[in-house]
Structure formats: C-alpha cells, structure tokens
Amino acid sequence: KFKNNEPKKNIISFSLWGDNENYTKGAILNATLAPVIYPEWTCRFYCDKNSVPEEVINKLISLGSEVLFLENNNLAYFGLFWRFFVIDDLNVDRYIIRDCDCIITVQEKLAVDEWINSGKNFHIMRDYASHTELIHAGLWGGITGVIPDMTTLIINYYNSTHKERTIDQRFLRDCIWPILKDCYYCNDSNYNFDNISNNYKNLGRLPINLNIGINW
C-alpha cells in the first residue's frame, strides 16, 4: 500500500557529483519543485562529499531533501549507480530514479500515480522517439524488496564490464530487466512495447516541443 502521508518512505533518488551547474542547479530546482509536484515523496541526493559545492549541499538540505555522502574514488562512471542504492534501503517502500539535469514535471507525476494505482512492482517511462531502451536510467522506479542485493549486483557488474557513459543503461538492460519484465507498468508516448504500454493523459501534458527526460 502506498503511504501518501509518509514521504520519507517514498524516495526520488538522484546521483550528484562535481560542480557542473547543469547538475547542481538542476538538483536545486528539482528539490524546490518536489514538495509541490511530489508532496508524498522526498528527494534524496547521493553526493560526492569531495566535489559538490558546500552551498549546493546546504541548499538541498534547506529545501527538505536528504543528502547522503559517498566518495567517487576515481571510479569511472560509478557515480551513475549511486542513485540505485536506494533500492537496498529497508526504510524505503517505493523509489523513483531520476537525473539531476532533467526537471520533474506534472506529466511524470500523473504517470507515477497511474503506476501506483496499477499495483505493479515497477514503473518505466519513455516519452521521445529516441527513448528505445528497455529501461532508461533516469525514468524508472519500483518497490523495495523485489530486487535482491542491488549493491552486490552493481559491484559485480561494474567490475566485469567496460566503463563508459552508458554503463548504467547496460546494467539495467542486462541485470534488472529480467527481474522486472513480468510486473511493470509502462507509460510510452511513441511505442507500444509488448502491447502493454500506456500513453500519457492529456491533463498535465508538456508542450509539444518538450518531453519527460529532456535535459533542461
């Protein structure tokens, strides 16, 4: 059952490292909008304690977000996986994974509500012609207790594969899709994969030149 009066049980999870304003300002904007668009949820930022500016951290905390500190340790692209660590948090019931540089919207919130009402374990969103991955790393979510030991899955995959910028996408395709493929709810505005996808409702829809997952 979705606990809409316990936002700490429902986490919007992000990774954040470095001082690139595309990500730091995006993080702050997401943290600002979340209490309005996602009042039943709490933002959580997994941050590199050595590279994210202190003023950004303080602002995120002041906006009501959770900040958890990690160290990058010069592991190429490993920070992309940090936001997935929420899946092993036993204090969390439900999570959605997002990108700092993609701003949350009413359109996606309505889709998330559809997923919750569907009773399915997982949620997948696609909203552009190039959204052709099985699972896009910043456009999915789920309930905890279904994926076993996510941290170990991540470490084993990371240590056994080529490190490049889509490593998180490949991990989801290779390791997570087989787990969720039989119990997910999908919103997709372009394709009807497996004949179970649902288009987005007209109410709350973004303008024609914008889409969920766009880099703002």
Where are these regions (language model features)?
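Active-site acidic short loop of glycosyltransferases
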Residues: 91-93
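Catalytic core and acceptor-binding pocket of nucleotide-sugar-dependent glycosyltransferases
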Residues: 129-132, 141-216
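A short, glycine-/small-residue-rich helix N-cap motif at loop->alpha-helix starts
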Residues: 74-82
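Conserved donor-nucleotide/metal-binding helix-loop-beta segment in metal-dependent transferases, i.e.
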Residues: 104-135
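N-terminal anchoring/stem segment of glycosyltransferases
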Residues: 1-72
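Conserved hydrophobic/aromatic beta-strand scaffold that supports enzyme active sites
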Residues: 86, 122-124, 139-141, 171
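Short acidic donor-binding/metal-coordinating loop in glycosyltransferase active sites
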Residues: 72, 100-102
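Short aromatic/hydrophobic "clamp" motif used to bind/position activated sugar donors
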Residues: 95-97
